[in-house]
Amino acid sequence: MSQEDEYLSVEQFLELQKAETREIIESLKADGSEPDALYAIEHHLMAEDFKALENAVVEAFKMGFEVLEAEELEDEDGAKILCCDAVMDSALDAEVIDAQVEKLVNLAEKYDIIYDGWGTYYEGEDAEYDVIEDGDED
């Protein structure tokens, strides 16, 4: 969320994430992705402060997530932000992914970083490995 967006409580944000999770899963299935495959669920974390992100990802690792190396990017205003993914292999099960999201949203709240949704890759014989992200349109 940008600073211009209306503030959402953690509970409201989690409800939005649940709806987006179901949309992503339905999009994958509608596109023919293998429903019984194991998917690498990539949860996106962002922070302006390296130490806050570092503390959060150490805790995410202890929760069983694989944490990918952080990258430094610039936002639309030119400010530097650090981004990384916390990854967990999972079935396309909304309740399982909801539980992962809830853990990481609460972690983001604890360390004052941003949980920026999740994405995964299409799985199937014709997979080209396009990433499906929350908020993307078909």
UniProtKB/Swiss-Prot annotation:
One of its GO terms (molecular function) is endoribonuclease inhibitor activity. Signal peptide: none annotated. The keyword Flavoprotein does not apply. Keywords: Cytoplasm. HAMAP family: RraB (MF_01888). Belongs to the RraB family. Coiled coil: none annotated. Globally modulates RNA abundance by binding to RNase E (Rne) and regulating its endonucleolytic activity. Can modulate Rne action in a substrate-dependent manner by altering the composition of the degradosome. Interacts with the C-terminal region of Rne. InterPro entries: RraB, RraB-like_sf, RraB_dom. It comes from Aliivibrio fischeri (strain MJ11). This is Regulator of ribonuclease activity B. Pfam families: RraB. Gene3D superfamilies: RraB-like. SUPFAM superfamilies: Hypothetical protein VC0424. GO terms for cellular component: cytoplasm. It is found in: Cytoplasm.
